[in-house]
């Protein structure tokens, strides 16, 4: 079962805001539950691996009562870590990803894991997606420590263009379910609070941030300037966390995006700049980023969006480059030190190259 090129099928099974409670523990992922959601008798559900991160990924092998049906490997994604599910906004994140696979994935032509079920409930507040286990099919996953070749990054930004064109011009009022979750902005401000900042940048293991970016107040001001309401016409539904660590690569080398947990309406350049800068080496980014932005814009137009040229969006790209500074604030509980340092180096170099801070705080000459 290869990754689908047009999302899930129009007949995706699932239910949003069901009054039937969804499982909150791995032990509740039973054969009777799979029988219920899949609509075919499941004889056994064997847990192969449990991976607990921001969301839990539970890999299982399903065997069916009908011997003619071959066993199936699936990945169940949702909130199955009790240490996290007690945090209300974490459940909101899981629900948001389920909403994406239910509402949006069937409508867009981009590589996505085939989805067997997507649901949310109003009892536990859980959000669950049951998808194909890509790992068992030979897929690999993006590693922030390993930059990508330019052609693969081009393929990825063209996929983002297809996503963006599908909801071009949308506002939070147009997609209300995508605005009812935890704010990334609140999370960043928490990480930039005085005590957290001091802890993050104390000692020799601090992220490789240039000295002029060590002014906490100035960096917070730049974030707030980036988040100010604008008259940008580049708004639509965005991935929100489009970095190399949230990708898969098929056995034939085709990339795709995963982890749709913070989708929201915002500027397309949030996704485009964040992905390009984090996925390429600094040298390749400097040599190719304008061409990649133009490739994105060309695909956006072919997919039904407006006809735009790089010069029309370049300042927006430069502004949203600053979002990558959030990597410097990521704690060891969020990402490994090696990944934080690698991504911080790439993003800070771009912030300097594009004079993003000066542009945001109004001091650019």
What are the residue ranges of the model-derived segments?
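Active-site activation/catalytic loop segments of kinase-like enzymes and analogous catalytic loops
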Residues: 99, 103, 262-265, 269-305, ...
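Conserved ATP-binding subdomain of kinase catalytic cores across diverse folds
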Residues: 48-190, 268
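Short helix/strand-bridging catalytic loops that position acidic/His residues to coordinate divalent metals
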Residues: 141-149, 257-259, 276-280
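Generic recognition of stable, solvent-exposed alpha-helical segments in well-folded globular domains
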Residues: 151, 155-158, 237, 242, ...
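Active-site acidic catalytic loop and adjacent metal/ATP-binding pocket
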Residues: 51-64, 75, 220-268
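ATP-dependent phospho-/nucleotidyl transfer catalytic cores
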Residues: 2-8, 15, 139-239, 251, ...
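Flavin-dependent oxidoreductase catalytic core characteristic
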Residues: 135-138, 142-147, 226-230, 242-243, ...
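Juxta-kinase regulatory segment immediately upstream of eukaryotic protein kinase catalytic domains
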Residues: 2-46
């Amino acid at each position: 079962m290869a990754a689908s090129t047009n999302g899930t099928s129009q007949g995706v099974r699932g239910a949003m805001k069901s009054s039937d409670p969804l499982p909150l523990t791995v032990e509740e992922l039973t054969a009777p539950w799979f029988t219920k959601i899949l609509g075919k008798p499941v004889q056994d559900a064997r847990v192969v691996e449990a991976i607990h991160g921001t969301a839990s990924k539970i890999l299982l092998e399903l065997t069916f009562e009908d011997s003619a049906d071959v066993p199936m490997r699936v990945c169940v994604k949702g909130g199955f870590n009790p240490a996290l599910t007690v945090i209300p906004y974490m459940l909101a994140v899981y629900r948001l990803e389920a909403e994406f696979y239910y509402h949006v994935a069937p409508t867009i032509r981009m590589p996505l894991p085939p989805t067997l079920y997507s649901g949310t409930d109003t009892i536990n507040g859980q959000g669950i997606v049951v998808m194909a286990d890509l790992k068992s099919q030979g897929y690999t996953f993006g590693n922030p420590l390993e930059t990508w070749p330019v052609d693969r990054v081009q393929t990825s930004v063209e996929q983002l263009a297809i996503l963006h064109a599908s909801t071009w011009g949308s506002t939070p009022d147009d997609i209300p379910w995508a605005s009812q979750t935890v704010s990334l902005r609140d999370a960043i401000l928490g990480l930039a609070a005085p005590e957290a900042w001091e802890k993050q940048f104390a000692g020799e293991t601090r992220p490789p941030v240039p000295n002029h970016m060590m002014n906490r107040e100035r960096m917070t001001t730049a974030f707030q300037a980036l988040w100010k309401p604008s008259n940008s016409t580049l708004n639509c539904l965005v991935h929100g966390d489009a970095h190399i660590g949230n990708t898969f690569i098929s056995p034939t080398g085709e990339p795709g995006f995963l982890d749709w947990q913070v989708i929201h309406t915002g500027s397309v350049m949030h996704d485009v700049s964040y992905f390009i800068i984090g996925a390429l080496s600094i040298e390749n980014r400097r040599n190719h980023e304008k061409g990649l932005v133009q490739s994105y814009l060309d695909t956006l137009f072919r997919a039904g969006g407006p006809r735009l040229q790089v010069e029309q969006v370049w300042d927006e790209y430069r502004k949203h480059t600053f979002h990558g500074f959030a990597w410097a604030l990521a704690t060891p509980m969020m990402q490994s030190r090696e990944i934080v340092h690698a991504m911080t180096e790439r993003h800070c170099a771009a912030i300097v190259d594009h004079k993003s801070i000066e542009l945001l705080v109004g001091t650019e000459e």
